[in-house]
Amino acid sequence: MNTRVLTGITTTGTPHLGNYAGAIRPAIQASTQPGVDAFFFLADYHALIKCDDPARVARSRLELAATWLAAGLDPERVTFYRQSDIPEITELCWLLTCVTPKGLMNRAHAYKASVDQNAAKGVEPDDGVTMGLFSYPVLMAADILLFNANQVPVGRDQVQHLEMARDIAQRFNHLYGREFFVLPEVVIAEEVATLPGLDGRKMSKSYNNTIPLFEGGAAGLRNATQRIVTDSRLPGEPKDAEASHLYMLYRAFSTQQESMAFRRQLEEGMGWGDAKQALYERLERDLAPMRERYVELISNPGLIEDILQVGAAKARKLAQPLVRTLRDAVGLGVLQPAAAKAAQPARKAAKDARFVSFRDEDGSFRFRLLAADGEELLCSVPFANPKEAGALMRRLQDEAPEQALRGHDDVSYAAWLDGKEVAYGPQAADAGARDALLAKAREALAQLAAA
């Protein structure tokens, strides 16, 4: 059985050497592995959240598509498409929006960061916050769930959004009484290559220290490598290879044998000028053929458009049947005679309280207690492994709710086991609201214990 892996490509900005080594190259290599059904999409709807310059969005879409294709992405082997070419994504986004609690979106890091920044400025909490930013995690969930991806490689800053996608999928499955969606696994690339920039810090446009991937051609690459900051050791003086970010750049693009030979040359006194020339030549050996292909693609956007349209058609063959099924599930299907409707399997008559587990962005494991209507009633403390979290969930079900759940102060409550606080409830507006939530949480635990 193949593992479906979905990778989203942000369509803002022009890729640099660090993007290639840290994301593009490893993702393309992974797509060639046996048993991998790889999906790659240009996340151009997401780009509108951050950028309102149409020319920049359009140019970035072209550059990103050309870059990935030039770097070796095989559209015959993978499914490569543009987000905006799949109308089923936005339809699914609305279906998911209708089952997603606002409280879940309130906890999204990007939204909370905007609120915190506004607080620091002394302006309204939601000043400048668009619905695109606020509901971004729902669109991301639609991207993933539409194709029932098994794995989604992300950076640590996106882990929360993957957990939200799982939560939303569980809510929908539970509400409509069937496993419509696979729960995607978060794949954090712990060994992602982080290249140093010209000044030794992480290569980033924010630091203005990037080395271009294709922009500026061979001359641009040579100019950038000549501007790499080095120490003051003269030719003939031994160099400390491990302390040199120039050596780290060379190592990221060379074989082990080449890397060892370059290291010896540095330790034997190779001058920095010669070292920069050697780095340029090694990079150019890899990048020149890709750059040639990139220039060819950029000058022929119609070819890229054809590739993306073929990918979109391939993706929609999978998306359309699922959306038809979902329409039927929520009552938006084709009108049928009463007899035909009666023959359809009945939806679950009632919803139940439930525990849902998730992995936090720091790698720890937690769980939530959700009411039948999806409202969060408890969130656990972090655990080192899922087994510990699961054991505590079972213990909470076995405990008398009145003993396990107690008021913490006037506006909050917590779950206690063995004299320790193991989970906490949401903060209420006042003592009355706290008591109502506490009663609801106790009722949910009692319901689980009786199940």
Curated annotation (Swiss-Prot):
ATP binds at T10, T11, T12, G18, N19, G155, R156, D157, L195, K202, M203, S204, K205, S206. GO terms for biological process: tryptophanyl-tRNA aminoacylation. Pfam families: tRNA-synt_1b. A motif ('HIGH' region) lies at residues 11-19. Its EC number is 6.1.1.2. GO terms for cellular component: cytosol. GO terms for molecular function: ATP binding; tryptophan-tRNA ligase activity. L-tryptophan binds at D143. Keywords: Aminoacyl-tRNA synthetase, ATP-binding, Cytoplasm, Ligase, Nucleotide-binding, Protein biosynthesis. The keyword Lyase does not apply. It catalyses: tRNA(Trp) + L-tryptophan + ATP = L-tryptophyl-tRNA(Trp) + AMP + diphosphate + H(+). InterPro entries: aa-tRNA-synth_Ic, Rossmann-like_a/b/a_fold, Trp-tRNA-ligase, Trp-tRNA-ligase_bac-type, Trp-tRNA_synthetase, YegP-like_sf. It is found in: Cytoplasm. A motif ('KMSKS' region) lies at residues 202-206. Belongs to the class-I aminoacyl-tRNA synthetase family. Catalyzes the attachment of tryptophan to tRNA(Trp). Homodimer. NCBIfam families: PRK12284.1, trpS. This is Tryptophan--tRNA ligase.
